Amino acid sequence: VDALSEHNPRVVSAVKLQRAAQRRKTGQFLAEGANSVAAALETGRVRELFYSMHAATRENPLIAGAAAAGVRTTLVSERAAEHLGETVTAPGLVAVCDHIDVPLADVLAERPTLLAVPVEIAEPGNAGTLIRVADAVGANGVVLAGDAVDPHNGKCVRASAGSLFHVPIARHRDIGEVLDAVAAAGITVLATAAKGEVDLDEADELLAGPVAWLFGNEAHGLDPAVAARADHRVRIPIHGRAESLNLAAAAAICLYASARVQHTK
């Protein structure tokens, strides 16, 4: 089989998916590396799997499994693999996938007991890490509220380490509509706030029922008007001298606190 070069039209089209405009236009995105590709294959969203000869020696069962499942598997040159990959050392394994996000109503229809709701999250690495944490704690969904980063951004996909394909993810631009819909579903809305009236260490009763956690933007935190709409504002106790925690760390602490209470009921 001849390897496709970086000039092949299929390779060129796939490389264009590194751009947000092309992802929006096609409804497709790239998943890079064995973890993400394996998770994508499990969901049946892969349209084509590009692999280099180098990757074929390392990930042969994964590639063979994809082919057996009817996925188009395509050998590409090492140069083409470098173009397809977004990391310095390209893994040589890149899948073209259909978008993963679902409507907010679909997430709420599953009667979730734990949701992560990052508001206006801007940094794709943080978004991917938060999605990975949500997956690890067994959350039922992630709702990217407001003007949020595209979860199909390559950096977000890589940071999620496959979790993007495990957890339902919704995007909804109108924050007020998100809060209304979550409340209407009978879910308690908690906002993280440095001066929250509830200490996380004393919040077990609140955490026992269905909960949606609001997390603020990396640079500006949670808009006070949004925090005011939550049922409660919760502070993470800081015993040392750090002024605050970054978004992913705060999310991990709060989501794990919820999971601990819900799993020990």
Please place each PLM-identified region on the residue numbering.
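Short, hinge-like loop/turn segments at secondary-structure boundaries
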Residues: A67-A68, G92-L93, A159-S163, L207-P210
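Structured adenosyl-cofactor binding patch, chiefly the S-adenosyl-L-methionine
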Residues: A95, V133-V137, P151-N153, R158-L164, ...
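N-terminal positively charged helical leader segments and presequences
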Residues: V1-V88
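RNA substrate-binding interface of SAM-dependent RNA methyltransferases
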Residues: N35, D101-V102, V107-E197
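Active-site/ligand-binding-proximal alpha/beta "capping" segment
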Residues: L190-A242
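Glycine/charged-rich beta-loop-alpha catalytic/anionic-binding loops adjacent to active sites
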Residues: Q18-A21, L108-A116, R229-I238
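Short beta->alpha connector loops at strand-helix junctions that form conserved
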Residues: S52, V76-S77, V119, A145-G146, ...
